[in-house]
Amino acid sequence: MRYLYTIFIFSYSFLFALPPLKDAEIDSFIIARYSGDTSMVNQTIASGFLYVHTPYVGLGVSAYYVDGSLLITDVVNDSIQTFLSVGDKIHEHNGKVVDKSGINTNGAVGEEQKLIVTKAGDSTFSELTIPLQLYQYEQDSASFVEEILKYSDLWFDFDVTIKEKVIRKNKVFVHYLWEGSKYESGDTYYFSAMEILYLNKKRDLVERIEGIWSEKQFRDQFK
């Protein structure tokens, strides 16, 4: 993967001196996450690191399209295990046969979704009615690094613009814009992210990252 990055920073420190983890190192850490530089990432995150994703409304599962159905590969919250489990297959969603584009679960918390599924190891079709819930997915360091590698493999090149960064004690608020292309001279895709990085007591490692609710998560609840 090739990458370029542009940094326009309005940085404010409320300390008399910069923390051990310098501004440039924080920038490099963000770039490393998207370039697939797992060595840099591993050097920057602390033992027991957690990445807390932006909250979203949905079914709380990850699924991939395989042979005409969506195979569930991960369940975010144990409470949904009463409905869906890893290995189950979704065949229909709200009366429509699923396809490789996945399913659109836009709606408010509590809105019911009707699914036709087969349970893992069973060929019997069942109809389930599952309400949408608010979920917040957490990743440990191993899962975080694995996801970095998968994501970097998807893109031919990318660019990160850090719009604003605020440092206060052991917290770093950062707002950045990502854009990238999957192919040379291909279409460009964009997203904007706001995150809080929590540093350890020495302020030289990142212990936790929290995604912040955005307008997109709010708008996605509407049909």
Annotate each language-model stretch with its function:
Residues 160-166, 192-199:
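Hydrophobic/aromatic beta-strand elements that line small-molecule binding cavities or substrate pockets
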Residues 18-74, 103-106:
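PDZ/PDZ-like peptide-tail recognition elements
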Residues 103-142:
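PDZ-domain C-terminal substructure recognizer with occasional recognition of PDZ-binding tails
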Residues 1-20:
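Bacterial Sec-dependent N-terminal signal peptides
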Residues 138, 146, 150, 208-223:
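Low-complexity, intrinsically disordered terminal/linker segments enriched in charged
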Residues 65, 126-185:
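Surface-exposed, charged secondary-structure patches
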